[in-house]
Amino acid sequence: MSISSSVAVLNVVQVSPPTAPVNNAFQDRISLTHFDLLALRAPPNQRLFFYETHLPISAFAETVIPKLRDSLSLTLQNFRPLAGTLIWSLHSDEPYIRIKDDDSVPLTIAETDADPQKLFDDPFQQETDLQQLLPPLRVSETEASLLALQITLFPSGDICLGITFHHAAQDGASLALFLKSWAHICRHGDDPPLPQNLIPIFDRDFIDDPKNIKQLFLDHLLTPLTPGGPRNRSVKPMEKPFNDRMHGSFRLTVDDIENLRRRITSLQVQNTSQEPPVRMSTVVVTCAYVLTCFVKAGLTKKHVRFILPADLRKRLQPPVPDNYYGNCVFGCTVDMSSDDLAGQDGLVVAAKTISSVVSELDANDHRTFFENFLLNNTISQEETKVGVGGSIYFSLDEKDFGWGGPKHLKNVPPWPNHIYLAERRDGDKGVDFCLMLAKQEMAEFESKFLDDLKLLEKRSC
């Protein structure tokens, strides 16, 4: 369904936190950790949350927008750095978030005559269409905003909350914390006190760096673009390497996941040389299956570099609080052969390899992983990079602004060949994920994905 020509921007409101901050710990800047630097130039992350308000159209301007705008301002009392600016000046050894009294977050107000149900019913959309529901960040080589929001009204009274954020300021867990806090304030009204678990911690001292990993990344980032050129202080995110791709939504049901587990176990019994996977978690099983579908659909080259992000908040010593705001994620990287993944034991190979690298992350010094990342960050011509984003462990129901949780969610992957896991409703044991691929590639993947699920179902009968 094409909606690109039907979205009209009505207004852009600059929303500032109240003049008197409730958190006096905020100074004029916040430093970045090595986890933040890892994402300094990554493409912006984007989310689309669709809500049924059950309100008349007239309430959009009279009630919905004022409520969202005012609660956003109150939320920024505790999340003040999100209204700041990421900069890397010529006089600074490192980038930082600058905080000023006149900082604000842009809130775009838009409307469309598109039918949202058609958008939900069709699992495939053009990426350019979805971008019409998403606001841009203000970015340049020297400065970048951290957050932009857009509210779009549909004729049915449904609304879409579009979010674009700079990854250097926050990871998925931090964004989820911000949205839960905003939703809590919006839902309760009149500046309610936030529960302690919804108050962010921006103190960078929680990220211990005794081996100076941060300097490794600063040296890497400052490398001149050309030999003998100036040191590279750009904070501009990379542009997405595609704008003509299809966005595809897929789902693995509880039965699908159990069938996959049984298939892995069966293959292990047949091949005694293979050790059982260290983990049979839902994420490992899902990623293993999707990765083998990628390979069987002919979407990879001779080798695959698979990147699975791991939240290190509880893995660091000492552990980092759950409400720490920033990045605390590292991508576990492992190389695999496409021939091995396409073979009869491909599902086992993928599951075992993915689970083992996570176990290795638990047991090893994190500096080693960062050093290996810098040494092996280039992709050869015979290698395809397949990454994972998002999380199934964030709850959609916690994003209730007063109209119930989102009816639908669409993540917009920042990279091609990126498996983006979606948040789930409480009690949902299935997995939704999305991909961004060229139209023909999407058709090939869908065919292999569905056909192999049917084979698994027959084997389980």
Curated annotation (Swiss-Prot):
Its EC number is 2.3.1.-, 2.3.1.116. It catalyses: a flavonol 3-O-beta-D-glucoside + malonyl-CoA = a flavonol 3-O-(6-O-malonyl-beta-D-glucoside) + CoA; kaempferol 3-O-beta-D-glucoside + malonyl-CoA = kaempferol 3-O-(6-O-malonyl-beta-D-glucoside) + CoA; quercetin 3-O-beta-D-glucoside + malonyl-CoA = quercetin 3-O-(6-O-malonyl-beta-D-glucoside) + CoA; a flavonol 7-O-beta-D-glucoside + malonyl-CoA = a flavonol 7-O-(6-O-malonyl-beta-D-glucoside) + CoA. A motif (HXXXD motif) lies at residues 167-171. Malonyl-CoA binds at S281, T282. Disulfide bonds: none annotated. One of its GO terms (biological process) is response to toxic substance. Keywords: Acyltransferase, Detoxification, Transferase. This is Phenolic glucoside malonyltransferase 1. It comes from Bemisia tabaci. The lineage of its organism: Eukaryota, Metazoa, Ecdysozoa, Arthropoda, Hexapoda.
